[in-house]
């Protein structure tokens, strides 16, 4: 049985603004994650609120929604063996200061809020997050 999975990756506004998209993509490819779909978009605060609704009771929710909608983002569907776990390891800890060396967040994250990337935290969430940004892709 193959452990081929898909996961969602978002390159957040801070990294897009600093022109890090190609560098981050090369890290993904080097780590055997295939980019199946990619698009650069600018979402509204309402769309960010819908995407992050699982966090709506948390104190950082409004800031998170404002941040994700503050500039262009790059959303990607990644595919690979155990893609969800693999990508989470490549991303590193949410807080760049605590992230392991050579992870995306350690290399490029500015702060716990502006940590450059988002990745799905489970296979089920990956499916719903992919559907959020690529609604008509897999019907």
Task: Go through each PLM region and give its residues.
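Non-catalytic terminal and connector segments of soluble metabolic enzymes
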Residues: 1-139
